[in-house]
Amino acid sequence: GVDIIGLSRALITNIQSGYFKEGGSTITQQVSRLIFLNNDLNFKRKIKEIIISLVLDLKYSKNQILKLYLNNIYLGSGAYGINEAAQVYFGKLITELTLSEIALITGLAPSPSIYSPYKNIDLAIKKRNKILKSMYIDGFISLYERNKALNEKVKLNYQTNNNDLKDN
């Protein structure tokens, strides 16, 4: 959908600052941008994004939109989508990933260049741990699963072509 309150807040902040400082995008809006538009920072593109998002909401379920997002989001090192990220970072199929590895990939989403385990493993692990904590608090995993994932050593795949320089 479209988060009217978030968009309004972003609009006010952007007008006050004189430049694009906030976006206020929902997952559906990010899918619209990822698949149909570009990252240009202008109001015309934002209006198109909102219209496409409304159409997507009418045509697809939330799960289908989430699937589109997860299969198209850039996760660093040349990986688009979680399937490619599983291969790039761990040399595995997504079905072979551990909870710890899934949490690490999830942590890349906000900023793949900042949270890249190839560039800053400590920061990537810190983000992974924060995600595992949230998953435990929200009841998605047990204390045992959280602790097991927290104690798992990160074993990155250095065999694939590491395109991390693209993220600079």
Q: Where are the regions that the model predicts?
A:
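Conserved catalytic or metal-liganding residues and their short signature motifs at active sites
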Residues: 1-13, 19, 137-138, 146
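Non-catalytic, structured segments within soluble enzyme domains
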Residues: 19-168
